[in-house]
Amino acid sequence: MSSHRRGSFRGRKRFYRDTFAPGGSKTDPLNIEIELTENPEEEKKRLGLLDPTTERSKKRKVEKDEKSEKPAENSPFKKNQYNSPRKDSRRPPQLSKEEKSAAENRKQKTEYFNKKYRYGNFDRYYGIRLNPGESDKRLSVFQKDWFEHKQALDIGCNAGFLTLSIAKDFSPRRIIGIDIDEHLIGVARKNIRHYCDHETEVSGKFPASFGVQFGTVSQRNEAPRSFSTKFPDNIWFKKENYVLESDEMLDMIQPEFDVILALSITKWIHLNWGDDGMRRFFRRAYAQLHPGGRLIIEPQAFDSYKKRAKMSEELKANYSKIEFKPEDFEMWLIETVGFESVEKLGVVGAKSKGFERPIDVYLKPLHPKTDAIPLGYI
């Protein structure tokens, strides 16, 4: 119960004369309405009628407006909430002189590598494909009677290891290895000495018979005048680009070999000379085979082209125009070029991934069709 008696004014708010404006009416004896209309916000504030939440939001708005009027800072760095500079991730890092020099050296090495090996003429090819002391597994699927007392050509022979093994183990009448890289041809010729048996008389880097048959290595690039089926007198290496410059030159090609090998080179021919060069290569091989001869190819898959196409702008341009894919080779070689059949030897294993490729053997008919389209117009 309150201690004040009924009707007492103790503790109640008192209103004095100067609290309200003078005047008034019957409906507004204290004249409150006129004060509110003249300055409603000020009157509400004086009477304590303002909404505190509204007042706070207005204050925040005023503060925000004041901040927005501050001049913008012309700084290249973004600032975090603690007002400290923060690195822009889009700006390239500043390299030291040593780092710039190392980057330039790497760039030069890459350019040198791409220019030197644009034909797939890698000088460590067999080191990647084979384990030390291991024989080439592709020899296991070849038949000796394909080569024995026959004439063979190995296109893209590299350092000559496979060519030398065929010359020594399969006894061809002659086998010639050709490569576009002169350095590799020099290495292949030197390797002849290492494949000779101990009883073979060796003079310098080559068998003694080479001086009579071939002359000085530096003086000769052409094949020797005569061959013997006995190794090492049945083998020679020479620098040559097998892809002719034009289709018209195909008319001059004559049958010369019983076996032509084109192992792991189709990708490089395709990238360097495009679809026209690839077709011209196959037509020359067909024309250079005797009736009943064999073309042995080891085509690379088309999905392996993309990586090597980046080696130069020319290779990249040729790659973008390729329509004659490796999966189209078989039908075109049989139906258009004139091969009689194809024997698939399967996939041969290798030390490194990517070298496990199928080997196909195309057979030229004993009696080629005389009504076939001339080679220069296929």
From Swiss-Prot:
Pfam families: Bin3 (PF06859), Methyltransf_31 (PF13847). Coiled coil: none annotated. Residues 136-367 form the Bin3-type SAM domain. The keyword S-adenosyl-L-methionine applies. Transmembrane segments: none annotated. GO terms for molecular function: O-methyltransferase activity; RNA methyltransferase activity; snRNA binding. Residues 42-72, 85-110 have a biased composition (Basic and acidic residues). Residues 1-15 have a biased composition (Basic residues). It is an enzyme of class 2 (transferase). One of its GO terms (biological process) is methylation. Residues 1-110 are annotated as: Disordered. Its EC number is 2.1.1.-. Keywords: Methyltransferase, S-adenosyl-L-methionine, Transferase. PANTHER family: 7SK SNRNA METHYLPHOSPHATE CAPPING ENZYME, BICOID-INTERACTING PROTEIN RELATED. Probable RNA methyltransferase. Belongs to the methyltransferase superfamily. This is Probable RNA methyltransferase Y17G7B.18. It comes from Caenorhabditis elegans. The lineage of its organism: Eukaryota, Metazoa, Ecdysozoa, Nematoda, Chromadorea.
